[in-house]
UniProtKB/Swiss-Prot annotation:
Catalyzes the isomerization between 2-isopropylmalate and 3-isopropylmalate, via the formation of 2-isopropylmaleate. Gene3D superfamilies: Aconitase, domain 4 (3.20.19.10). Its EC number is 4.2.1.33. It is an enzyme of class 4 (lyase). The keyword Lyase applies. It comes from the Bacteria. The keyword Amino-acid biosynthesis applies. GO terms for cellular component: 3-isopropylmalate dehydratase complex. One of its GO terms (molecular function) is 3-isopropylmalate dehydratase activity. InterPro entries: 3-IsopropMal_deHydase_ssu (IPR004431), Aconitase/3IPM_dehydase_swvl (IPR015928), AconitaseA/IPMdHydase_ssu_swvl (IPR000573), IPMI_Swivel (IPR033940), LeuD (IPR050075). This is 3-isopropylmalate dehydratase small subunit. It catalyses: (2R,3S)-3-isopropylmalate = (2S)-2-isopropylmalate.
Length: 201
């Protein structure tokens, strides 16, 4: 997993509430176990018509938002089934941060495990960021995880909370495998000691 570093990116406004995981990545794309290649199918049923053509009015199809790395979303983002393909699809599209007033718990946790930062803020602050995101390609925000700050295109600074352990993992690029490998020496020492103490096991 890549280390999460301070970055400046385009923020896309997506005010619709209750965007569920089926809207993020429909069920027909869940056959793969690869994390790459799903970005093209993110928000598939909103992004494309039945003929597979792009829907011009969908926010991520607009020229100003095609390179978005931040989503400012409506309440209860990521609700629905617990498919991990949802954060896979967003990450593969290029999304690094999702900001909302609330998230479904499983989706929220899966974001951290896949190198994405979900940020929960009060409604008034989300409204401010949503308005800023509506500026199109000028809607560039800076996210500083170390300082736990979002800086808008106008220079307004918004503080956010994040669990210290989750923050540590993102900053150091540690997923579950990476966390285990941090303890590789201790695991090896335990296995060697256990083999001597209980050779019959």
């Amino acid at each position: 997993m890549e280390k999460f570093e301070t970055f400046t990116g385009i923020a896309a406004p997506m005010p619709l509430v209750n965007i569920d995981t089926d809207m993020i990545i429909p069920k027909q794309f869940l056959k793969t176990i690869k994390r790459s290649g799903l970005g093209v199918h993110a928000f598939d049923e909103m992004r494309y018509d039945r003929q597979g053509n792009e829907v011009p009015d969908f926010v991520l199809n607009k020229p100003a938002y095609r390179e978005s790395s931040i989503l400012v979303a409506g309440d209860n983002f990521g609700c629905g089934s617990s498919r991990e393909h949802a954060p896979w699809a967003l990450a593969d599209f290029g999304i690094k941060v999702v900001i909302s007033t609330s998230f479904a718990d499983i989706f929220f946790n899966n974001c951290f495990k896949n190198g994405m930062l979900p940020i929960v803020l009060p409604q008034e602050q989300v409204d401010l960021l949503m308005k800023d995101a509506e500026k199109g390609e000028n809607a560039r925000m800076t996210v500083d995880l170390e300082a736990q700050e979002i800086t808008t295109s106008e220079g307004d600074v918004i503080k956010f909370d994040v669990d210290p352990f989750r923050k540590h993992c993102l900053i150091n690029g540690l997923d579950d495998i990476g966390l285990t490998l941090e303890k590789a020496d201790a695991i090896k020492a335990y296995e060697e000691r256990a083999a001597q103490e209980r050779p019959w096991v």
